[in-house]
């Protein structure tokens, strides 16, 4: 999971992992 990368982009990792 690229939660860290998404956090930097400002996108909630919840939406990405969903």
Curated annotation (Swiss-Prot):
Transmembrane segments: none annotated. One of its GO terms (molecular function) is hormone activity. Pfam families: Pigment_DH. GO terms for biological process: chemical synaptic transmission; response to light stimulus. GO terms for cellular component: extracellular region; synapse. The keyword Zinc-finger does not apply. Keywords: Amidation, Hormone, Neurotransmitter, Secreted. The keyword Oxidoreductase does not apply. The modification Alanine amide is found at residue 18. Belongs to the arthropod PDH family. Causes the migration of the distal retinal pigment into the proximal end of the pigment chromatophore cells and thus decreases the amount of light entering the retinulas. May also function as a neurotransmitter and/or neuromodulator. This is Pigment-dispersing hormone. It comes from Pandalus borealis.
């Amino acid at each position: 999971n690229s939660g860290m990368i998404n956090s930097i982009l400002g996108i909630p990792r919840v939406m990405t992992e969903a």
